[in-house]
């Protein structure tokens, strides 16, 4: 199976090589059709692929699904803004890793993000967990060839290759992706793991993706349990401000963390403390002083001294929290 796939890709590469041409310096190419923006920065366009990298369980998939929700709804989701042209509105997810139940639950969250009553007809989700690399590639080729396809998410790209440390195989796969996006004018989002030992995308495949991708984004799990999306490599624009998300128990879905996590000592009154308080007491509606300090420190992103001397007294004084018999709770207005 591996040999057949490699031979097929080699044959295609030989055929594609005949497409070499001199670049016309007197003819300006069509303008880039930018479809993914983050914080006003240009991240991804049709005819290119981008990469989302990160350690396992860092929530790479959550951000990818937010792209789907944004592309279909036309609104910003988790800080990501997708804008597909009218003739390229179809969105495709190739999920190679999740179980059926995990995929179902993730799609329900995407549905909630996009505020859809039902899943739209221009969205197609493939369950490819049991498929071989050659079978995965066949589905990808068919979806790219559909004239209305604008966005394809590959979760994850390692399932399109036998050996991600094989230089030749990795090179052929990346060149194949470049040919598919260019020929069919689609944008592909690859999800790739980062190696725990090197902190780089895995193998020769990861190195080549970083080299040829339009943008590489990295998802990092923070100490307080939040996840941060940041720019690692940006070819066509400056880095965007990192986007941080957290699990919002109030809506049973992910939300963008409020701005001002690292505010200065003198502007406590300008902060949306209510959101922070909800998160501090999300898992336990009653805290002792030691645990309260830990939670305040993590959620606000401040030092323990600042939490103890400034923040907690401020929250008590302004009735964001209440102290009853040595325990701390969210303040509840009796009226």
What are these regions (language model features)?
Residues 30-37, 134-135, 197-200:
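Short gly/ser/thr-rich secondary-structure transition/capping motifs
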Residues 65, 69, 73, 134-145, ...:
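Amphipathic, non-transmembrane alpha-helical secondary structure
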Residues 66-67, 102-110, 139, 172-176, ...:
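Alpha-helical scaffold elements adjacent to nucleotide-binding pockets in ATP/GTP-utilizing enzyme cores
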């Amino acid at each position: 199976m591996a040999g057949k796939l490699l031979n097929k890709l080699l044959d295609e590469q030989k055929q594609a090589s005949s497409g070499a041409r001199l670049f016309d310096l007197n003819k300006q190419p069509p303008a880039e059709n930018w479809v993914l923006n983050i914080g006003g920065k240009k991240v991804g366009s049709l005819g290119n692929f981008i990469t989302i990298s990160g350690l396992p369980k860092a929530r790479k998939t959550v951000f990818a699904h937010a792209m789907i929700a944004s592309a279909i709804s036309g609104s910003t989701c988790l800080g990501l803004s997708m804008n597909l042209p009218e003739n390229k509105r179809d969105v495709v997810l190739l999920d190679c890793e999740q179980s059926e139940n995990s995929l179902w639950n993730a799609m329900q969250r995407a549905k909630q993000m996009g505020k859809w009553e039902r899943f739209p007809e221009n969205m197609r989700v493939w369950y490819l967990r049991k498929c071989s690399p050659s079978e995965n590639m066949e589905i990808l080729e068919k979806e790219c060839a559909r004239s209305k396809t604008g966005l394809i998410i590959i979760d994850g790209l390692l399932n399109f290759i036998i050996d991600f440390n094989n230089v030749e195989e990795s090179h052929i796969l990346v060149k194949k992706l470049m040919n598919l996006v260019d020929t069919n004018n689609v944008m592909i989002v690859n999800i790739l793991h980062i190696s725990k030992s090197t902190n780089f995308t895995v193998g020769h495949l990861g190195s080549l993706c970083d080299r040829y991708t339009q943008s590489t984004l990295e998802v990092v799990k923070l100490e307080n349990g939040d996840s941060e999306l940041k720019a690692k490599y940006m070819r066509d624009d400056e880095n965007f401000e990192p986007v941080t998300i957290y699990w919002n128990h109030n809506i049973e879905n992910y939300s963008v963390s409020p701005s001002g996590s690292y505010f200065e000592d003198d502007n406590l009154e300008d902060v949306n403390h209510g959101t922070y308080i909800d998160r501090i007491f999300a898992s336990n509606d009653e805290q002792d002083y030691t645990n309260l300090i830990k939670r305040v420190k993590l959620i606000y992103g401040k030092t323990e001294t600042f939490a103890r001397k400034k923040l907690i007294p401020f929250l008590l004084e302004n009735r964001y929290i209440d102290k009853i018999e040595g325990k701390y709770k969210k303040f509840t207005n009796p009226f």
